[in-house]
Regions:
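Extended catalytic core of nucleotide-activated donor transferases of GT-like folds
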Residues: 7-9, 48-133
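C-terminal alpha-helical cap of glycosyltransferases
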Residues: 368, 389-421
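A charged, aromatic-enriched C-terminal amphipathic alpha-helix characteristic of glycosyltransferases
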Residues: 349-357, 367-398
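Donor nucleotide-sugar binding/catalytic pocket of nucleotide-sugar-dependent glycosyltransferases
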Residues: 120-171
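Acidic donor-binding loop of glycosyltransferase active sites
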Residues: 275-292, 303-306
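Conserved catalytic-core segment of nucleotide-activated headgroup transferases in glycan assembly
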Residues: 21-23, 28, 166-275
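N-terminal pre-catalytic "stem/leader" segment of glycosyltransferase-like enzymes
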Residues: 1-76, 225, 394-399, 419-421
Length: 421
């Protein structure tokens, strides 16, 4: 049986959020369409993020590496492009864009135009889908500046959540992650990149969380610690020192006798992260910013069934149940100039957590921890059963069956040999 040709352009071997999404997506695609499509991978860079996510010694990873091809010689039947949407190009007979888009309430026009170039698109959360669907811009003539029309979403868009691998993120009786240097028995943990923006203005609100944690527990005899798993762009001694300096600036702004913050720096395997989340000293997860999806929330919940403090805005609310988690107060505000970039445009808004609400939430979980355990277990069960990788595979099958038009695979015809006259 001849198969349709399928090429997936993505950062398959890159250590980054888009890299992780690419690997999960392609593995799911192989499960769903591997018998019908000849699936190949066009490996791409992702900014300055390092390579090396794939391991030759892992059979699934080796299969992905063997599917990597050089420059294409002909048009594929099916084309997937996992990247920022302004880079989308309709290369295949059917072209499908996969993107996280943005974490704000307005999509830049160039991303909308990219979505409209594809046959259909796949995003990670309902928040992102709604942002795309609700954004429109006036299209102006470059010379007269007169309105010529409207730029808005014209192509279908589907939601495929980033399912957690429950074979990797799961409950453990004992954790062998070494936290012996941490003296505190109660630690909050936060996981996320330290992104651009002044203190209190970064997308993930790490600086707001750090400052609120220090303020909540300063000058107290009994207090928890905060484990901060973060990085800027890569992993280096210089970058680590830069992060420590940033933390020190916040500490000096608070003053007093402050609780400890432990920087956990460097790349960890998923097995190591699972052991970290299951450690007895790690009691709760806190992250109060804006997410396209929010993989760390889901992975922590599935692994540990421990309490989560979060913002009530953006991608992670798809899977964080309002009844089972602690949501901080705040308001949706226009972006600060220090956080603006090509895709996070100045006209857009996102969630700004209220520092006092963060402090109150941290104190409540620390001082009344047993109160939050049952709901955390319910959230963990929901994460493992409703938002697993296997459920993601099922959802991908539904999306493809619904949206990919029928294409006939090329047939090989064997002609009979003719007699020579």
């Amino acid at each position: 049986m001849n198969k349709l040709t399928c090429v997936v352009s993505c950062p398959i071997d890159v250590i980054s959020g888009y890299g992780a999404r690419s690997r999960d997506f392609v593995k799911a695609l192989i499960k769903v369409k591997g018998e019908e499509w000849d699936i190949k991978i066009l490996s791409q860079r992702w900014g300055e993020c390092p390579y090396g996510a794939l391991d030759n010694n892992v059979p699934e990873d080796l299969d992905l590496l063997r599917r990597v091809i050089g420059p294409m010689e002909r048009q594929p039947d099916i084309w997937f492009q996992i990247t920022v949407a302004n880079e989308f190009q309709p290369v295949g007979k059917v072209s499908i864009g996969v993107s996280a888009l943005v974490e704000t309430n307005i999509l830049p026009a160039e991303l909308l135009e990219g979505l409209n170039r594809m046959t259909f698109n796949i995003v990670s959360s309902n928040f992102v889908k709604d942002t795309a669907a609700n954004t429109s811009f006036d299209k102006l003539d470059q010379n007269t500046k007169q309105k010529q029309g409207t730029v808005e979403l014209t192509k279908p868009i589907e939601v495929l959540f980033e399912g957690v691998d429950t074979n990797k993120y799961k409950r453990l009786e004992n954790s062998d992650f070494d936290l012996s240097e941490i003296k505190e028995e109660f630690c909050f943990i936060t996981v996320g990149h330290w992104l651009a923006g002044d203190v209190g203005e970064d997308r993930k609100q790490l600086t707001t969380l750090i400052k609120a944690f220090l303020s909540a527990f300063k000058d107290k005899k009994k207090r928890p610690a905060l484990i901060l798993k973060t990085s800027l762009a890569g992993f280096s001694i210089i970058e680590e020192e830069t992060i420590l300096d940033k933390i020190d600036v916040i500490r000096k702004s608070v003053g007093g006798d402050m609780p400890n913050i432990y920087l956990l720096y460097g790349e960890l395997t998923e097995e190591e992260m699972n052991h970290l989340y299951n450690h007895d000293k790690v009691k709760a997860f806190a992250l109060v910013g804006n997410e396209g999806f929010g993989r760390p929330y889901l992975e922590f919940s599935a692994a540990s069934s421990k309490p989560i403090i979060a913002s009530p805005f953006s991608g992670h609310v798809d899977f964080l149940n309002q009844e089972f988690n602690i949501f901080v107060a705040g308001r949706v505000e226009q972006l600060h100039p220090s956080a603006v970039n090509q895709f996070l445009i100045k006209e857009s808004s996102w969630f700004k957590a209220d520092p006092k609400s963060i402090e109150d939430s941290l104190k409540a979980v620390y001082e009344n921890y047993p109160k939050y355990i049952d709901n955390a277990k319910r959230q963990g069960h929901q994460s493992r059963t409703q938002f697993s990788y296997d459920k993601m595979v099922e959802r991908l099958a539904e999306i493809l069956n619904k949206n990919v038009p029928k294409i006939s695979a090329p047939q090989t015809i064997t002609l009979p040999k003719l007699k020579t006259l």
